[in-house]
Amino acid sequence: MPNLKFIRDRIQSVKNTKKITEAMRLVAAAKVRRAQEQVIATRPFADALAQVLYNLQNRLQFGEVSLPLLTQREIKTVAVLVVTGDRGLCGGYNANVIKRTEQRIKELKSQGINYKLVLIGRKAVQYFERRNAPIQTKYTELSQIPSASEASTISDELLSLFLSETVDRVELIYTRFLSLISSKPVVQTLLPLTTKGLDTPDDEIFRLVTKGGKFQVEREKVSASVSSFPQDMIFEQDPVQILDSLLPLYLNNQLLRALQESAASELAARMTAMSSASDNAGELIKTLSLSYNKARQAAITQEILEVVAGANAL
């Protein structure tokens, strides 16, 4: 029969662990809400920028404009920007991004294309350093809710690589937020920008709410405004110069939104993992408590038998 003190200590240990996982779940839930607020806060700027670029596109037609960020070159080297986290305890979030990156690298190699890695997050850095992969730049210890200045620093690095023709294309691998229990690693081409113009598709903004004491996600369709400038509007500067200045800003905005979605995905994965850990801890406590009660009952029964046996011997 298990030792009573051992079982009692084990129960206390599991209870302490459950307190930690429950606290981590609540912290992650609060940070998911903050990530949502950041996405909403950047929407007015993103909408206005999309509107300006959309109208400039109609005025100029990108196919007739020669701009560095629109230049299509023969693809010899690709910069792959990989977004992971610095910490674990978030389910398969980091592993899924790394797995998708390995698949993309395999695809590039099969096409005879070289690649350079730009890594965000300690998990990606540790993984690819162990495999001696060609790492161009590493970024760790970013804010849990990425800021515009952090996105700008990374964006400048990518622009430098592309404009210097060190790489001919820039791809981004990040985790798209789908729900609190679902996310998907995706590959997106950042550079060069499409020559057919800038898309303004319907976007989905997620909102974390509580219903019946549980966290749920509401999704809202948001469309960027595309109302036109007056046709007789005169630009003080050459529209091409305006476009040349706004495209890097657009790239930075796209990168910021991808970083924010990745952060939300990581926090949601951590919240789900900690919720599952708390539930498992509760079940383990029940099992250990049952074992403890059985052992205690057996010990009491044994003592009674010994007392009765001693009395009979007298």
Swiss-Prot record:
Q: Which Pfam families match?
A: ATP-synt (PF00231)
| GO terms for MF | ATP binding; proton-transporting ATP synthase activity, rotational mechanism
A GO cellular component annotation here is: plasma membrane-derived thylakoid membrane
What Gene3D superfamilies does the record point to?
Answer: 3.40.1380.10, ATP synthase, gamma subunit, helix hairpin domain
Protein's cellular compartments: Cellular thylakoid membrane
The membrane spanning regions, by residue number, are none
What is the membrane topology listed in the Swiss-Prot or TrEMBL record? Peripheral membrane protein
Q: Where the protein is mainly located, per its record?
A: membrane
Recite the UniProt keywords alphabetically: ATP synthesis, CF(1), Hydrogen ion transport, Ion transport, Membrane, Thylakoid, Transport
Could you confirm whether the keyword Phosphoprotein appears in this record?
no
Extract the InterPro entries matched here: ATP_synth_F1_ATPase_gsu, ATP_synth_F1_gsu, ATP_synth_F1_gsu_CS
How is the quaternary structure described?
F-type ATPases have 2 components, CF(1) - the catalytic core - and CF(0) - the membrane proton channel. CF(1) has five subunits: alpha(3), beta(3), gamma(1), delta(1), epsilon(1). CF(0) has three main subunits: a, b and c.
| Family note | Belongs to the ATPase gamma chain family.
Q: Report the function annotation for this chain.
A: Produces ATP from ADP in the presence of a proton gradient across the membrane. The gamma chain is believed to be important in regulating ATPase activity and the flow of protons through the CF(0) complex.
Q: Could you tell me what this protein is called?
A: ATP synthase gamma chain
What organism is recorded for this protein? Gloeothece citriformis (strain PCC 7424)
